[in-house]
Amino acid sequence: MSLLNPYFGEFGGRFVPQILIPALNQLEAAFVDARDDPTFQTQFNDLLHNYAGRPTALTLCRNLTAGTRTRLYLKREDLLHGGAHKTNQVLGQALLARRMGKTEIIAETGAGQHGVATALACALLGLKCRVYMGAKDVARQSPNVFRMRLMGAEVIPVHSGSATLKDACNEALRDWSANYDQAHYLLGTAAGPHPYPTIVREFQRMIGAETRRQILQAEGRLPDAVLACVGGGSNAIGMFADFIDDASVQLIGVEPAGLGIETGQHGAPLSHGRVGIYFGMRSPMMQTAEGQIEESYSLSAGLDFPSVGPQHAHLNSIGRADYVSATDDEALAAFMQLSRQEGIIPALESAHALAHALKLIHQQPEKEQLLVVNLSGRGDKDIFTVHDILQSRGEIQ
């Protein structure tokens, strides 16, 4: 019997080996208990404020919108300790793991931001840390790999399958199946088996709560739309959660179109996938005609995931949120524009959301609109990737 609803409409659930059911039940009970405990909430909020640096700023982009009637704000999760929104919910889950008496943390990572956040939380709270990472991602995210190792984490490259996030998730689950007595699986996104999608949303929802307060203070009204990139979907659900009941606020999630939807080289299961069971949940995913998981692709490692969190699937199915996509080239152009015009280097993941915002702005420059983009992370980790692309194009030496 679940303490919390395991489904979002028809999506979600808990499709895992029987051996993991007790661990998931224990996690759900511990979360409900901690959620209702003022002492836990005080500890969590103290870490968010004094260690992670919350609240993060809401920054008006005057240069990007010059010559238009749009006011565009960025929610600056890139300023958070660790460099991305990942730190929020990792601190929450790590505190929860310690409360449950766990001594080890298992995690997966794509871009490395979740791995870095997990490593810093484990160092802070005295927990042993091992992080699974696709071998391709280890190669393209070497700065984050070194950061994790500097903070004492064991980084384990995964060579199976596509050697990306999907495969790292599979290996992390195998490890947890063998070690759940002493280890907590610190899942990095709002996906997977119940209760993870709910836990991650609740530990990320301060993004939207702060944005709501800040935009009302700055503009005296709610935004017309909030935008966020969507891989598994944690930064987006953190931004959306406090606006879901506001019918006047459009929720826009931006999936990676990769090399173009028509090429098949993308990571857009909400727009172009089919519903199935994967990673312990029922949700849309990229599948072959035979029902096998199809390899996803994105220039941004953190969006290179073949499925999506179940609450996003539900919001999409009921028409409450709109899910669009941006290509590698569009994200790269937005990355360069923000860097050169506002002096802010975004993560390539976040640049997907910005790319769609810029499209909306320039399609109707005369339209008076108030937009907020969740700048989910900073782009330090991506500078070598971008350098190599610009060099290959002959745009830099």
Curated annotation (Swiss-Prot):
Keyword Amino-acid biosynthesis assigned: yes
Pfam families (alphabetical): PALP
N6-(pyridoxal phosphate)lysine found at: 86
Protein source organism: Edwardsiella ictaluri (strain 93-146)
Family membership: Belongs to the TrpB family.
Listed cofactors: pyridoxal 5'-phosphate
UniProt keyword list: Amino-acid biosynthesis, Aromatic amino acid biosynthesis, Lyase, Pyridoxal phosphate, Tryptophan biosynthesis
GO CC list: cytoplasm
Catalytic activity: (1S,2R)-1-C-(indol-3-yl)glycerol 3-phosphate + L-serine = D-glyceraldehyde 3-phosphate + L-tryptophan + H2O
Pathways per UniProt: Amino-acid biosynthesis; L-tryptophan biosynthesis; L-tryptophan from chorismate: step 5/5
Enzyme Commission code: 4.2.1.20
Entry-linked SUPFAM superfamilies: Tryptophan synthase beta subunit-like PLP-dependent enzymes
Name of protein: Tryptophan synthase beta chain
Stretch forming the signal peptide: none
Function of the protein: The beta subunit is responsible for the synthesis of L-tryptophan from indole and L-serine.
Database matches in CDD domains: Trp-synth_B
Lineage, opening ranks: Bacteria, Pseudomonadati, Pseudomonadota, Gammaproteobacteria, Enterobacterales
Keyword Coiled coil part of the UniProt annotation: no
Gene Ontology MF terms: tryptophan synthase activity
Subunit architecture: Tetramer of two alpha and two beta chains.
